[in-house]
Every structure is written in structure tokens, then in C-alpha cells.
Amino acid sequence: MIRRLAALSALSGLATAWLPEVNKKITSTNGTNLFSSSNGKIRGVNLGSQFVFEPWIAEKAWSDMGCGGQKSEFDCVSSLGQAKANGAFASHWGSWITQDDLAEMVSYGLNTIRVPVGYWMREDLVYSDSEHFPQGGLQYLENLCGWASDAGLYIIIDLHGAPGAQTPQNPFTGQYAPTAGFYQDYQFERALKFLEWMTTNIHQNDKFRNVGMLEVVNEPVQDAGKVGSMRSTYYPNAFKRIRAAEQSLNIDRNNYLHIQMMDRLWGSGDPNESLTDTYYAAYDDHRYLKWAGVAVSKDSYISTSCSDQLNSNTPTIVGEWSLSVPDSVQWNSDWAPDSNKDFYKKWFAAQVTAYEKQQGWIFWTWKAQLGDYRWSYQDAVAAGVIPTDLNSLAGLKVCG
């Protein structure tokens, strides 16, 4: 994560965990160390729609796959049939995020990728009589992580789509489920089996050598009273099962994975509530002012971001954020992306300033087909809104 982590007293218990520059160096095949700068923070992008397709991000690609009009991967596979869907998704996996994309990320000063995946990547967990997901994704995940490791990128793998869906009516779960069916023991068990399997793959396959963090579920329901079983049962068992898998492989404790959960600020309760040991824990916060009820003015957005203190649990990475603003104003003249680049440059800098008070940030997302750089890091760089020298942001002095 950061080279100075061991020096931070609040995080001293994490000093022997598997983090870049603490106990293990990350270098590219040509010897480049992306964590060797004086900053050393996580600076990354999400690979949205690579292995868990969200149609709103890339409608053209979705339509080209034959999935147009379908709400989720589950729906598309149901519509196309398994064999045809497998071919369509394989073509997508091989072209959406490429080795050239990863090289471009590195050239922009990024050092981390977060890779959303679904539990169905472990295919024997899928109920063949009632669940419909694409098959064959593991090979493409291996290739991607191998390229990223060669490039010197740190990798977080995130269980983005949980069994039964951790939130209703949202394609980021891989299905458009009417209710959140995840919060019951048999679904937890399927997720735990996925985590064990993923942990074993990470430690036994050299292509996964730069994977240092495994997130146990993305964006659970934001109602602590409804997800008590997740905190009391799933989180403790995730720790136990991941550690048991590592111990069975005789993994040195310095090479253990960080186990990541959404932090308390997310709204699903305190993730540490039932944990007896948080020695290797990490936390994720998602900060979208678009939906945060902040007064809709440019000054308010800048001041809110500059004053953000996202430290309810430590170490926290702000694992999703963007430059998008409320739907009601996003195309108004005062907020339109093409005519307000100066504001978006400053707001980007303000958010980076806040999130680097913690362990760093991961923008949502790397690429999109929206014609709107506020959701696409790649497009924002091309538009001149995000600099290729991220250290130059300090010179803007947006937050004083």
C-alpha cells in the first residue's frame, strides 16, 4: 500500500501484512517500482465492466455482444443461451481491458487496479438449474493479473457480485434481483467457498503475485439493521476461511492477503463488530457526492471534498469515486463537462487531497462509453482534466 505505513502509529499493527514496500517490493519486468515516489499512496482505477458488466457504462459494447435490452449478465446469458453467451463474453474479456490499457495506466502515474469479479467465476458454485452466468472468465483474469504484475501494478480483487445478490435491482451484482438474497447462511457459504478458492489461486499462481488484497463483498445494503448477519457471521468466517486457506499452503504471514470490507461510513454497520482479530484488515469507502445530499454548488463540492475525513476505520482506501454530479444538473451550462473543465480539474484535486489523507484512492472507472469523462479516467486525461503527473495537483493548492 504505502512505504511509510509501518511508521504510522495508528496502523502499526499492519506492519507485517502484505503491502507494497512494507514487506514485499513490487517491480515491473523492467525494474520500475511504482510505489517508490515520495507520495507512495494508492492511486488507482477500477476495471468496471470487465468481469461484471454494468450495461449503463458501455451500452454499445453490451449491444455488440447481443445483450442489448438485457439488464444484467444473468439476463443476457439467459437470453443468448450458455454457449453463445460464453463466446460473446470471451470476446469482451479479451478486448475491454488490454495490456495496452495497463501500460497507459502506468504512464499516467497510477499504481493500482481494483478488479471487480463475481462469485460465478468459480463455476461449480453456480446452480446450473436456476442461475445463468458466463463461463470461462478465470483464464482472462489470470492473463489480466499477469500483465498487471508484469507492469508493476498492485492488484485488489473485489467480490463485486455475491451469491443471491447483496443489493437488489443493481447489475453490479451480476443479476437484477428483486430482493437482496445474500444475507442467509447458505449464500454466505457459497461466498466463503469462493474466497477460499480465490485465495488459493492467488497464492499458487505466479500471475497473481501482485494481488495483495481481497475484498469480501462490495457495497452491501446500506442499512445496518438488515445486515447484522453479515457482520456477525460472514465477516468473521471470511477471515477464518481465508487464513485457513493460507495456512494450509504454509504461506508466510508477511505474505498474507489483506482482507477488505466496506467501512462504517458506508452505512452497513461497523465491520469490526464481531471480529476478534483485525490485524490484516483493510477497509473500503465509496464517496460519490452525486448521491450524498451535498448542496449543489461548485463551492460546496470543493469545500466538502477538501474537508472530508474518511477515517472511521483504518486503513481505508476510497475504492470508488467519480467526478459525476446529480442527474438534475449534470448537463446544465454550469456543470456540463466540456464548458466547466476548470472546475472539474479543481474538484479532482480536492478529492485526491482528501483521499490521500487516508491510504489513497481508486477512481470509478478506467473507461466507459458514455461520452462523459466524469465517469472515465482515461477520457478525463484525454480531456486535460486529470494530469498525467499526479504530484502536480499539490501545486493547484485547491484546499489551501
Curated annotation (Swiss-Prot):
Extent of the signal sequence: 1-17
Record GO cellular component, one term: extracellular region
SUPFAM superfamilies in alphabetical order: (Trans)glycosidases
Lineage: superkingdom: Eukaryota
EC number: 3.2.1.75
Organismal lineage: Eukaryota, Fungi, Dikarya, Ascomycota, Pezizomycotina
Active site: 219 (proton donor), 320 (nucleophile)
Alphabetized GO MF terms: glucan endo-1,6-beta-glucosidase activity; glucan exo-1,3-beta-glucosidase activity
Keywords: Carbohydrate metabolism, Cell wall biogenesis/degradation, Glycoprotein, Glycosidase, Hydrolase, Polysaccharide degradation, Secreted, Signal
Protein name, per record: Probable glucan endo-1,6-beta-glucosidase B
Reported function: Beta-glucanases participate in the metabolism of beta-glucan, the main structural component of the cell wall. Acts on lutean, pustulan and 1,6-oligo-beta-D-glucosides.
Family annotation (InterPro entries): Glyco_hydro_5, Glycoside_hydrolase_SF, Glycosyl_hydrolase_5
Enzyme class: hydrolase
Catalyzed reactions: Random hydrolysis of (1->6)-linkages in (1->6)-beta-D-glucans
GO biological process annotation, one example: cell wall organization
Underlying gene: exgB
Matches recorded under PANTHER family: GLUCAN ENDO-1,6-BETA-GLUCOSIDASE B
Entry similarity comment: Belongs to the glycosyl hydrolase 5 (cellulase A) family.
Glycan attachment residues as annotated in the record: 30, 272
Places the protein is found: Secreted
Stored Pfam families: Cellulase
